[in-house]
C-alpha cells in the first residue's frame, strides 16, 4: 500500500496537508522575506524522499516539505490511508458495478418475483453505509504495512526468488479462498447470521451493486484474509496492488448474473447466484475445492446457462418455491417487499 500512498501523496495529499496544516517556521530560520521560498522549506525539512518502489519514481512537489505533518508522520499516514481505502473503494465499486450493470446485467431480472422493490437503490445505500466503517477497521492493517511490519518486498532480489514471483498469485488465491470459506460459513451460523450476514442475503436476485452491499463487519470479516496474507507470506508490492484491484473486480463479477461457463473449478457467478438463492451452499470466493471438501458444493444446473430458460416465468415459479421454504427455515419470516408489492408466500415468525 506504500506505492498507492506515494502516488496519492504526490498528486493530492502533499498539497492538502501543506494548505490545511502548514509548517510553522521560526523567524530566525529566514533572515529576509526573499529567503522564505518553497526551496528553503525543503532545505530545512528533516524528511527525505525515498521511493516506495524501484519501478516508479515520483519527484515530490515542493508542497511535500511545507506541512507540519510530513509523509512519514503516522497520523498523516493513517488519515490518508483511511481516505484512500474509503474513496478508492467507492470509485472501484461505482465504476465497475455501473459498467457491469449497463453492459452485462440482464435487465429482465427486474421482473423476477423475488426482485425487491427499489433494490438497486437499496444496494447502493447499503454499500455507501458500509464502506466508510470498513475503511476505519481496515486502515490500521495498511498503516502497519506502510510502517514496515509486513512481508511486502519490491524486487525479485528482495523476495524468495523468481519462482515465488509467480507462485505468490495462486498462493494468495488459495489461502484467502480457504479462509473466506470458513469465515463465510461462520457468518451463516444461526447466532451470527441475523446480525451480520442477513443484510447481504436480502438480495435474492442480486445486481452488480450488491457486491459491496453488506454489514460493515460482514464485509470486514470476509476481507480479513486479504489483509493478513502479507503478514504471513511474502508479497511483491505491485502484485499486492494488482490483487486488491482484482478481488474488488471479482466481487462485482460474481454478482452480475452473467453465467459464462459451468467450470467445475471456479466458483463463478452461477455458483454465487446459487448461494444467494439457496443460502447454505457455495461459500467459496474463487474456487469450488473447499466447498467440495466441506460438503457444501452445489453444481449449477445446465438451464442456468441457457439465457432464455433462466429468465422464463415457468422456471422462476419452480425456483421460488424452494427459495421461500429456505427463507422461512433460515430467517423465520420474510420482511422483503418485492416488485409486486408483497411476497408471494406470507410467513410467520
Curated annotation (Swiss-Prot):
| Alphabetized UniProt keyword annotations | Endoplasmic reticulum, Lipid biosynthesis, Lipid metabolism, Membrane, Oxidoreductase, Steroid biosynthesis, Steroid metabolism, Sterol biosynthesis, Sterol metabolism, Transmembrane, Transmembrane helix
Q: Mind telling me which residue stretches traverse the membrane in this protein?
A: 84-104, 124-144, 162-182, 227-247
**Which one of the record's GO molecular function terms can you name?**
iron ion binding
Q: Where is this motif: Histidine box-3?
A: 272-276
Q: How does it sit in the membrane?
A: Multi-pass membrane protein
Q: In the UniProt record for this chain, what is stated about the effect of gene disruption?
A: Leads to a severe decrease in ergosterol production and virulence when ERG3B is also deleted. Results in increased production of deoxynivalenol (DON).
Question: Where is this protein primarily located?
Answer: endoplasmic reticulum
Q: Where is this motif: Histidine box-2?
A: 197-201
Tell me the compartments it is located in.
Endoplasmic reticulum membrane
> Per the record, what are the reactions this protein catalyses?
episterol + 2 Fe(II)-[cytochrome b5] + O2 + 2 H(+) = 5-dehydroepisterol + 2 Fe(III)-[cytochrome b5] + 2 H2O
What single Pfam family name could you report for this chain, choosing any that match? FA_hydroxylase
**Fatty acid hydroxylase domain location:** 170-296
Question: What InterPro entries does this protein's entry cite?
Answer: Fatty_acid_hydroxylase, Sterol_Desaturase_Related
- EC number, UniProt record: 1.14.19.20
Position of motif Histidine box-1? 184-188
Which Gene Ontology terms of cellular component type are present? Answer: endoplasmic reticulum membrane
Q: Which family does it belong to?
A: Belongs to the sterol desaturase family.
Remarks, miscellaneous? In Fusarium, the biosynthesis pathway of the sterol precursors leading to the prevalent sterol ergosterol differs from yeast. The ringsystem of lanosterol in S.cerevisiae is firstly demethylised in three enzymatic steps leading to the intermediate zymosterol and secondly a methyl group is added to zymosterol by the sterol 24-C-methyltransferase to form fecosterol. In Fusarium, lanosterol is firstly transmethylated by the sterol 24-C-methyltransferase leading to the intermediate eburicol and secondly demethylated in three steps to form fecosterol.
Role: The third module or late pathway involves the ergosterol synthesis itself through consecutive reactions that mainly occur in the endoplasmic reticulum (ER) membrane. Firstly, the squalene synthase ERG9 catalyzes the condensation of 2 farnesyl pyrophosphate moieties to form squalene, which is the precursor of all steroids.
Protein name in the entry: Delta(7)-sterol 5(6)-desaturase ERG3A
Q: Which organism is it from?
A: Gibberella zeae (strain ATCC MYA-4620 / CBS 123657 / FGSC 9075 / NRRL 31084 / PH-1)
Amino acid at each position: 500500500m506504500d506505492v498507492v500512498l506515494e502516488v496519492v501523496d504526490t498528486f493530492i495529499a502533499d498539497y492538502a496537508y501543506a494548505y490545511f496544516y502548514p509548517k510553522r517556521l521560526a523567524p530566525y530560520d529566514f533572515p529576509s522575506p526573499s529567503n522564505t521560498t518553497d526551496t528553503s522549506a525543503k532545505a530545512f525539512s528533516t524528511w527525505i524522499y525515498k521511493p516506495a518502489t524501484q519501478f516508479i519514481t515520483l519527484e515530490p512537489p515542493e508542497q511535500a516539505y511545507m506541512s507540519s505533518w510530513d509523509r512519514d508522520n503516522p497520523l498523516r499516514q493513517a488519515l490518508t490511508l483511511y481516505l484512500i481505502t474509503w474513496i478508492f473503494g467507492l470509485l472501484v465499486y461505482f465504476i465497475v458495478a455501473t459498467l457491469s450493470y449497463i453492459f452485462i446485467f440482464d435487465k429482465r431480472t427486474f421482473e423476477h418475483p423475488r426482485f425487491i422493490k427499489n433494490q438497486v437503490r437499496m444496494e447502493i445505500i447499503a454499500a455507501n453505509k458500509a464502506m466508510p466503517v470498513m475503511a476505519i477497521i481496515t486502515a490500521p492493517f495498511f498503516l502497519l504495512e506502510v510502517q514496515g511490519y509486513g512481508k511486502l518486498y519490491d524486487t525479485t532480489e528482495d523476495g524468495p526468488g523468481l519462482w515465488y514471483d509467480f507462485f505468490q498469485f495462486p498462493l494468495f488465491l488459495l489461502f484467502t479462498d480457504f479462509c473466506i470459506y470458513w469465515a463465510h460459513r461462520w457468518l451463516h451460523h444461526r447466532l451470527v447470521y441475523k446480525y451480520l450476514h442477513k443484510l447481504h442475503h436480502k438480495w435474492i436476485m442480486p445486481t452488480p451493486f450488491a457486491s459491496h452491499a453488506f454489514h460493515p463487519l460482514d464485509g470486514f470479516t470476509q476481507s480479513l484474509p486479504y489483509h493478513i496474507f502479507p503478514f504471513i507470506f511474502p508479497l511483491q508490492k505491485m502484485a499486492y496492488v494488482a490483487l486488491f484491484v482484482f478481488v474488488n473486480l471479482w466481487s462485482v463479477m460474481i454478482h452480475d448474473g452473467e453465467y459464462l461457463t459451468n467450470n467445475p473449478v471456479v466458483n463463478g457467478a452461477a455458483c454465487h447466484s446459487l448461494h444467494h438463492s439457496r443460502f447454505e451452499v457455495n461459500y467459496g470466493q474463487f474456487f469450488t475445492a473447499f466447498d467440495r471438501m466441506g460438503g457444501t458444493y452445489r453444481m449449477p444446473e445446465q438451464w442456468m446457462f441457457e439465457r432464455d430458460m433462466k429468465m422464463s416465468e415457468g422456471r422462476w415459479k419452480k425456483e421460488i418455491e424452494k427459495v421461500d421454504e429456505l427463507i422461512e427455515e433460515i430467517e423465520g419470516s420474510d420482511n422483503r417487499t418485492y416488485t409486486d408489492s408483497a411476497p408471494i408466500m406470507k410467513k410467520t415468525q
